Structures are given as C-alpha cells and as structure tokens.
Amino acid sequence: MSGKIKVTFIINDGEEKTVEAPIGLSILEIAHSNDLDLEGACEGSLACATCHVILEEEFYNKLKKPTEAEEDMLDLAFGLTDTSRLGCQIILTEELDGIKVRLPSATRNIKL
C-alpha cells in the first residue's frame, strides 16, 4: 500500500514540525529524511535506545506491543515514559495518520 500520512514531531523546545511521510517507513527514517535530531546510532538494529520517542497514548495504543528486545533497549533510554517506543520499530500505517512524536531532550548511547 502506498500513500502518505501526516506525522508531527515535537522537538524538545515544544516546536512542532509536521511532515508528510510515506506509509511503510519507520519514524526513525522519517526523522532522518527531514533533518530532525533523532540519532539512531545502531541504524535500526535494536542495539541501542538513541531513537527513543514518546507518543501520545492514543497512538501508542494503536501499535503492536513492543517486542522483548525493544523493551530491553527501552530500559536503557533516558527519560522513559509509559508511552515510550523506539522510532526504528514504529512503521507508519494509515491508522497512524496524524501521529505526534515527541523527541526527548536527551538520549543515552550505551556502548558495550
């Protein structure tokens, strides 16, 4: 399915940037293609928590539950909340049209 949805990124100073994003890409990919500061040190391989984002509950509840591997990485995230997810694991669908994604003010990159 091809198409686009609206994604709003809330940057740590409260500024909002709304973009049109292709369905099927991840939040991490959309952030990078729009020059937003979402690190993604492991490039989506579930080996870090630098693409940690915070969602509104409405959209968090539309996603599949995080895998155990994602939960393990989220445990390392700075500023973890009940609606935290990794941006690399959120794949855009039509159902997520209008999603708001808050970028935390800091990330923690743990090098093993």
UniProtKB/Swiss-Prot annotation:
Binds 1 [2Fe-2S] cluster. One of its GO terms (biological process) is P450-containing electron transport chain. Keywords: 2Fe-2S, Electron transport, Iron, Iron-sulfur, Metal-binding, Transport. Pfam families: Fer2. InterPro entries: 2Fe-2S_ferredoxin-like_sf, 2Fe-2S_ferredoxin-type, Adrenodoxin-like, Adrenodoxin_Fe-S_BS, Beta-grasp_dom_sf. [2Fe-2S] cluster binds at residues 42, 48, 51, 88. Residues 5-107 form the 2Fe-2S ferredoxin-type domain. GO terms for molecular function: 2 iron, 2 sulfur cluster binding; electron transfer activity; metal ion binding. PROSITE patterns: 2FE2S_FER_2, ADX. Its cofactor is [2Fe-2S] cluster. Belongs to the adrenodoxin/putidaredoxin family. Ferredoxin are iron-sulfur proteins that transfer electrons in a wide variety of metabolic reactions. This is 2Fe-2S ferredoxin. The lineage of its organism: Bacteria, Pseudomonadati, Pseudomonadota, Alphaproteobacteria, Rickettsiales.
